[in-house]
């Protein structure tokens, strides 16, 4: 396709820019460049309108563009730098550094639009990824090379949970991570960067960094937010395919990817579908998700925070991502209101890996028994609210007492929340998690007060806390 093909801007409508070409038209998804008062502005071709005009989506602000301005076709899609040099750096959607630490110099650049691996290239074994977070490892374990959705409304702790996962996995697993910040708060992106420097995950002096960051935050135009997840994924694919790594790919927040698509969809003149979303919702989501997979060379394990508009899981945006997930971790506001963090709902979180053939018989039985006790407590809550605890049978009272202890034992102090809570974070081994909950459901700890189980790591700490409480009471 013709490189350096020149065109002129004919119309600017928000983030959508129409460009007229006299010669050959650039193909769909090609990158065009223009100069906007000294800044390089990249436009991506979205539609061909008639013989000589293309409709494009801008990757940055379009203020200052004028009709008649010259635009150059680059002859290919948007590319981003890939390789070990991107670790420890923050880039934007077009691969420019935004951390004020000089240019990112790499031997290669990859296009952000790439084909998903073929059937023959994919690997299918199931292996558990231990996170050190009790509720996740017990109830909805994550698999290597799997896709995990973190569902929750505003302010229930999705971002904190993602930060803890990055922290635990970088320490316990030592692999590389790529973090794509899609349409979230810039403050959180800045906090994450500084926390990673403090934790040693980003090494400013040497080359020990474990994570690459790609940001397209809330203040960015929708074009950048709709493409930044693809830019991050491209960097993760390099580590998987060229270096044979098991990579972790974090997206915060995948809903904003859909939201950005819906913002430009109307400007592109498409007829909206249900709830005003773009008609290509499932296609856009599939194109991103199908590239996140394990191949025979390495794997990409993806953790995606999914904002649920108005806490409605049937909304088309969260519903479109459900189909692609291997495990779901649902955060519940009513659990957060009890002060139990992480506010993961053990009855609403699922995993394909919670299968005796994958996790083993003991783990499976303990997890199901924990869910059974919590479900019984949930169904008794109406009776308790109306008639009180005294009207329950002896057996039901025991179930309620155990369920309340289990609920509290599912909470855990996080390393990344130390600055707010003052209590040091805990990383709990899978063995300790299973042992602790097995003892709880079998009634070994019926004599301990429920408050002893709140915000501790393993069972030994709960017993220690109970002794301390007894000593203080005496």
Swiss-Prot record:
GO CC entries: plasma membrane; proton-transporting ATP synthase complex
EC numbers, comma separated: 7.1.2.2
Chain positions recorded as ATP binding sites: 152-159
Disulphide bridges: none
One annotated GO molecular function: ATP binding
Enzyme class (EC, first level): translocase
Catalytic activity: ATP + H2O + 4 H(+)(in) = ADP + phosphate + 5 H(+)(out)
Domain of life: Bacteria
InterPro entries from the UniProt entry: AAA+_ATPase, ATP-synt_VA_C, ATP_synth_F1_bsu, ATPase_a/bsu_AS, ATPase_alpha/beta_chains, ATPase_F1/V1/A1_a/bsu_N, ATPase_F1/V1/A1_a/bsu_N_sf, ATPase_F1/V1/A1_a/bsu_nucl-bd
Topological relation to the membrane, as annotated: Peripheral membrane protein
SMART domains: AAA (SM00382)
Keywords (A to Z) from UniProt: ATP synthesis, ATP-binding, Cell inner membrane, Cell membrane, CF(1), Hydrogen ion transport, Ion transport, Membrane, Nucleotide-binding, Translocase, Transport
Compartmental location: Cell inner membrane
Similarity comment: Belongs to the ATPase alpha/beta chains family.
Subunit structure: F-type ATPases have 2 components, CF(1) - the catalytic core - and CF(0) - the membrane proton channel. CF(1) has five subunits: alpha(3), beta(3), gamma(1), delta(1), epsilon(1). CF(0) has four main subunits: a(1), b(1), b'(1) and c(9-12).
PANTHER family xrefs: ATP SYNTHASE, ATP SYNTHASE SUBUNIT BETA, MITOCHONDRIAL
Function: Produces ATP from ADP in the presence of a proton gradient across the membrane. The catalytic sites are hosted primarily by the beta subunits.
Name of this chain's protein: ATP synthase subunit beta
Record gene name: atpD
